[in-house]
């Protein structure tokens, strides 16, 4: 079971192909331009970043992302959040001390740095140790306060996003070929993942009902927080044959990852709840990955309805061309039926329906901290509003069509 941090060496078989594509861009800057964002807040960070789609061959990048997702699901029971950013750090670049509690359950750094041949100092990932600062410890310095993890080529580092971390300043070359290069992103929970005989909608309903009860049982443990994921094996009778923890970063702020009676109690209650789930009987076994956020979040579904007076065919065409690339949503799924329902698998199960006179969206309650849910709702609302607004439709509408009025939105959030 993975806790706090974890390193996977030699992570991706095509790392050299990715690095060679990047080197080709650097060596021939006139013909292979990379549009970097100079990301600078002098108090906190200075580095360059870009999207990897314009750097790596599409097929290689897709295989990397698929491999990353598969590893995350098998090892953590969680999924990466969209496409990572490509970071470049040369002389003078740094990342100051910070934590990413609102970004995900885990952060990751996949290094494409030629670490063994580097001509700079700095550039490691600095992770503060638990219990820092402590006024009871005297003469503490260096590795007693933090851990430095080198950015070795083709290494995947994951760590608890709540850990205060940094990248020490780079001192050395300005040549990007000799810089610190990494893909950086975050990992979070998705809806329960189901394989086998049981219908996913039935499984999710059973789990959601159990979460409501679990929330009441752990409510008194106010200082316990984190995410634990379980891999459940369900027999043909519907009973849980095994409940295995894949990852567990449940802690208290006071104890960190050290022993805590409160954490142990919450783990036991949660394990018992997962082991005691009862599903319908089926023709074969099923496997379910279940993430649990402690404290339990808002368990109401995310629901939106917004009016429109567009022809459904026009609206459907518009939505199909734009839905998969909405920033902040990162929806993965497929259009079903007559192409009027987009069934979402990730990051949270749900659907978007284009109906006569209205667009409706309904998603399962995600196992995310409140700020992550809020950001998702804001992005979803913005997309639905743009879908109903004439200004975004004009390119698709025949000229004689009248522009629709924007309808009121209704939300249960």
Please report, for each region that a protein language model flagged, where it lies by residue.
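Terminal, regulation- and interaction-focused segments at domain boundaries
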Residues: 300-329
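A conserved amphipathic terminal alpha-helix motif
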Residues: 372-402
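Short, flexible surface segments
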Residues: 121, 152-153
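Ser/Thr-rich, low-complexity intrinsically disordered terminal regions
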Residues: 322-351
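Beta-strand/loop substructures that line and gate deep hydrophobic ligand-binding cavities in soluble
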Residues: 346-381
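Charge-biased low-complexity segments
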Residues: 140, 144-146, 153-156, 162, ...
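Conserved double-stranded beta-helix
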Residues: 30-133, 162, 186, 288-299
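Non-heme Fe(II)/2-oxoglutarate
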Residues: 1-73, 200-213, 225, 235, ...
